[in-house]
Amino acid sequence: MPSQILQISHHLPPKSSPSTEMMFKSLIYDDPSTTLLSRFGDDHHTISSTVKPLLSRSSSYNGTAMKTSSSSSAGGFTGWYQNRRRRSNSDNCLSAFSDDTNGTADGGNNSGDRQTTIGQEVGHAAAETFLLTRLCLKLLSYLGVGYRWITRFMALGCYAFLLMPGFIQVGYYYFFSPYVRRSIVYGDQPRNRLDLYLPKNSTGPKPVVAFVTGGAWIIGYKAWGSLLGQQLSERDIIVACIDYRNFPQGSISDMVKDASSGISFVCNHIAEYGGDPDRIYLMGQSAGAHIAACTIVEQVIKESGEGDSVSWSSSQINAYFGLSGGYNLLNLVDHFHSRGLYRSIFLSIMEGEESLRQFSPELVVQNPNLKHIIARLPPFILFHGTDDYSIPSDASKSFAETLQRLGAKAKVILYEGKTHTDLFLQDPMRGGIDEMFEDIVTVVLGDDQEAIGKSVDRRRLVPEFMLKLAHWVSPF
């Protein structure tokens, strides 16, 4: 039965004022046939204070606001960018890699692959272990013994224990599947590596999702995206999970630089692995959503001629998917402090209080001097759970409203009762139908109804009672 769309209007905006489209999705055990759609008018004032740009660049894109209907899942939103003019960019600043080997998309050998050998990977793992141990000791000196941090750490242990059956199965897939290409080098900095998750079916170029993992800017790692990579690859989508330097190994500018280098590698080399360079989607989760948003905004500023030379084009990004992200750091500092990510640590990560505006995409796009970059931004689709206490869902709503008010394409989908980790971990481990997963697949596959309708048996990885307990003890 098609979803029922209920229009709820708090107050009608002027006809000349764009509105942000927001969808509320019910819990999986609620009535899935009911979807509430509300439009929010423009009550905000443009921030006139100068905002230092992240970095820069752009791509011409014009269109009207998306309209959602009960039948839009097959391609309503995809119409936003299907006719976008894509530019190819052969410029590649990452042409030399010292520890490359060969391999193919289907697990064989090919001269185009840059995957390390087992011996190199063991050596790399040992070096990384030593490095991360030293960094953890340094990190502990920042954290001290704050009671909030200690309680979160204990809750994290319980949470990981409850989901361990799923982690073991995903870990086995990650290390032993011939369709996972681990630790492909994309740059010359520490942790400049990415993992590729390849479909079993190698016919035809595949759409690609470049994924930036979360981890509070401190504990992010490329393997955190292995469950997403496995499940999307089962739907004939290539996933590139990009690793990056965490704090204190690097600060936010290093993270954005690494993410940009990883995206550049994907844009310039994904065809060697069976990917379609004209169908690339950028996705981030939690801190990764913030880093990815900073990266794409920085890129369009660069492209507009206000930054350094570029090695990839924002026009290659068909859409941005932001999962449970925060985009206005000024509004989140106190909240993070109350949750155990203390102000002193957070400001160190973000390179000082004076840099918070520079690394807040929601504020950067409102800079009056950067109005010309809006048309170059890809469509933004933001996903958030209404019971997310790590980063409140208002963060996504506010960013979407700001983008839409400025003329960019933006949509926020809220999932009723979902927490910070439900959408990314518990729901995928539950098996069966996953609303957010299907929402992503529908956009990525576009009008390919055959691929969208492909039946994939998503098996349960963790017993239901353990998932429910994990929901309650999650420190995120």
Swiss-Prot record:
Keyword DNA damage: no
Superkingdom, taxonomy of origin: Eukaryota
Residues passing through the membrane, by range: 153-173, 208-228
UniProt catalytic activity: [protein]-C-terminal S-[(2E,6E)-farnesyl]-L-cysteine methyl ester + H2O = [protein]-C-terminal S-[(2E,6E)-farnesyl]-L-cysteine + methanol + H(+)
Broad class of where this protein is predominantly found: endoplasmic reticulum
A molecular function GO annotation: prenylcysteine methylesterase activity
Membrane topology reported for the UniProt record: Multi-pass membrane protein
GO cellular component, one term: endoplasmic reticulum membrane
Compartment(s) of residence: Endoplasmic reticulum membrane; Golgi apparatus membrane
Keywords from the named record: Endoplasmic reticulum, Golgi apparatus, Hydrolase, Membrane, Transmembrane, Transmembrane helix
InterPro entries (alphabetical): AB_hydrolase_fold, BD-FAE-like_dom, GDXG_lipolytic_enzyme
Tissue expression summary: Expressed in roots, rosette and cauline leaves, stems, flowers and siliques.
Ranges for region Disordered: 92-116
Protein name (Swiss-Prot/TrEMBL): Probable isoprenylcysteine alpha-carbonyl methylesterase ICMEL1
Natural source organism: Arabidopsis thaliana (Mouse-ear cress)
Species lineage: Eukaryota, Viridiplantae, Streptophyta, Embryophyta, Tracheophyta
